[in-house]
């Protein structure tokens, strides 16, 4: 018997790439002196597809076309067709301007971008995906942490420092990068009337951002300015850096609605239910004057000529977000359960119920993970200690009530086929 087991181990074939045996994979393909398994083949195909996609995103002048940019955005961001078109055209024109700046006497001005939309609708993801497509340095900054120079908080120059760090201190690359400033709606004026007291985190930050957004040579301290005052400064020209500002602008829809009401009154007036339109629908009618009333200063709005408004995500879009993208939430949790040798299944009704809960919470796609955690918390707590669990099924009852997801055991599966339906 010992000799037979020794022969079996000698005859066992292994993948030359990952080292798995023929018994651990579905298929092992033989080549001259090497073997490759089906899992490694799939991995190689994914790598080739990604490289082909990024290599294909180049037109004759080295800049992806708007259609190509929009096509890749579709792979990562669900919905928001109008915002994708606006972004694709603006980014294409920006990098085309950079590549042809020396070939004409006409100087093309930069068009920074403002993204306005409800929370959890994909503003940040759009900016991150753009940077990935174009292979340029990208950094995100939180506007709420910024203050005027000389006050407690971060200086505006720290944004350029983060971009330098993302480009590994290559100044030339950093000068063609993308900066995304989030929560820009939180740096609005505290009131419409100018005050005798300084607004160092609101209007003061807008004033400080004006120069770097328009284009200036910023003196950037490599280690941060306030802690190391004696260091040498790096000179970074911000003229060709693309700035994208994003914010939820809570309450802006009311300003837009008020502007559209007019002065009609009496029996002939058009009476509308204030809840009949969503926030995203109001944003479609946005005018620059609405942003001024919200608290942005005219000079700041003028530095952001391209405005893309995003819509609320409906039920179908949220269900697609749960299952569609490469790193979809459902796939993430299924992988977690796979590590416990348990199959996780969601019914179609459960998906719809999760999407409806996210809409009621008004948290957009960002709230989906919180809902999934609530549903699966007790199951994930009990499952590692439970023996024989083969499958967990999440149905509509588990989403809408305190009912736990169904746990199907291996020895009971033949006796209880109806419990999973």
Swiss-Prot record:
Family, per entry: Belongs to the ClpX chaperone family.
Organism: Jannaschia sp. (strain CCS1)
UniProt GO molecular function: ATP binding; ATP hydrolysis activity; ATP-dependent protein folding chaperone; protein dimerization activity; unfolded protein binding; zinc ion binding
Subunit structure as annotated in this protein's UniProt entry: Component of the ClpX-ClpP complex. Forms a hexameric ring that, in the presence of ATP, binds to fourteen ClpP subunits assembled into a disk-like structure with a central cavity, resembling the structure of eukaryotic proteasomes.
A Pfam entry, by short name: ClpB_D2-small
Transmembrane parts of this sequence: none
Binding site residues for Zn(2+): 15, 18, 37, 40
A GO BP annotation: cell division
Assigned keywords, A-Z: ATP-binding, Chaperone, Metal-binding, Nucleotide-binding, Zinc
InterPro entries on file: AAA+_ATPase, ATP-dep_Clp_protease_ClpX, ATPase_AAA_core, Clp_ATPase_C, Clp_protease_ATP-bd_su_ClpX, ClpX_bact, P-loop_NTPase, Znf_CppX_C4
Residues in ClpX-type ZB domain copies: 3-56
Role description: ATP-dependent specificity component of the Clp protease. It directs the protease to specific substrates. Can perform chaperone functions in the absence of ClpP.
GO cellular component, one term: HslUV protease complex
Protein name: ATP-dependent Clp protease ATP-binding subunit ClpX
Binding site for ATP: 118-125
CDD domains named in the record: RecA-like_ClpX (cd19497)
Gene3D superfamilies linked to this entry: 1.10.8.60, ClpX chaperone, C4-type zinc finger domain (6.20.220.10), P-loop containing nucleotide triphosphate hydrolases (3.40.50.300)
């Amino acid at each position: 018997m010992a000799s037979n087991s020794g022969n079996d181990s000698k005859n066992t074939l292994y993948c030359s790439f990952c080292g798995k045996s023929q018994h651990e994979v579905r298929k092992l393909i033989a080549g001259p002196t090497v073997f490759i398994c089906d899992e490694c083949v799939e991995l190689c195909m994914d790598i080739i597809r990604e490289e082909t996609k990024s290599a294909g995103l180049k037109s004759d002048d080295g800049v992806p076309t708007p259609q190509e940019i929009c096509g890749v955005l579709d792979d990562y961001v669900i919905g928001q067709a109008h915002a994708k078109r606006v972004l694709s055209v603006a980014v294409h024109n920006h990098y085309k301007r950079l590549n042809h700046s020396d070939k004409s006497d006409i100087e093309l001005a930069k068009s920074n971008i403002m993204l306005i939309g409800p929370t959890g609708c994909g503003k940040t993801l759009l900016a991150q995906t753009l940077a990935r497509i174009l292979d340029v340095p990208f950094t995100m900054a939180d506007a709420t942490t910024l203050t005027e120079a000389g006050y407690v908080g971060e200086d505006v120059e720290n944004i350029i420092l983060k971009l330098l760090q993302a480009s590994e201190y290559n100044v030339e690359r950093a000068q063609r990068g993308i900066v995304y400033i989030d929560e820009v709606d939180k740096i609005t004026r505290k009131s419409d009337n100018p005050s005798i007291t300084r607004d160092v985190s609101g209007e003061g930050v807008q004033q400080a951002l004006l120069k770097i957004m328009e284009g200036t040579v910023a003196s950037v301290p490599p280690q941060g300015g306030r802690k190391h005052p004696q260091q040498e400064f790096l000179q970074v020209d911000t003229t060709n850096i693309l700035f994208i500002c994003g914010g939820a602008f809570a309450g802006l829809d009311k300003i837009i609605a008020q502007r559209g009401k007019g002065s009609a009154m009496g029996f002939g007036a058009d009476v509308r239910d204030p809840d009949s339109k969503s926030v995203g629908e109001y944003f479609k009618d946005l005018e620059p004057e609405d942003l001024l009333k919200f608290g942005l200063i005219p000079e700041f709005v003028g530095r952001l000529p391209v405005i893309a408004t995003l819509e609320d995500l409906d039920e179908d879009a949220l269900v697609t977000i749960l299952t569609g993208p490469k790193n979809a939430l459902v796939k993430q949790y299924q992988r977690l359960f796979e590590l416990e040798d348990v199959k996780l299944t969601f019914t179609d009704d459960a998906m719809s119920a999760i999407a409806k809960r996210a809409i009621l919470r008004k948290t957009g796609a960002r709230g989906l993970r919180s809902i999934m955690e609530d549903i699966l918390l007790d199951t994930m707590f009990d499952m590692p200690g439970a023996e024989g669990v083969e499958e967990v099924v999440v149905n509509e009852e588990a989403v809408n009530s305190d009912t736990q997801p169904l746990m199907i055991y291996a020895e009971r599966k033949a006796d209880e086929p109806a419990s999973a339906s």
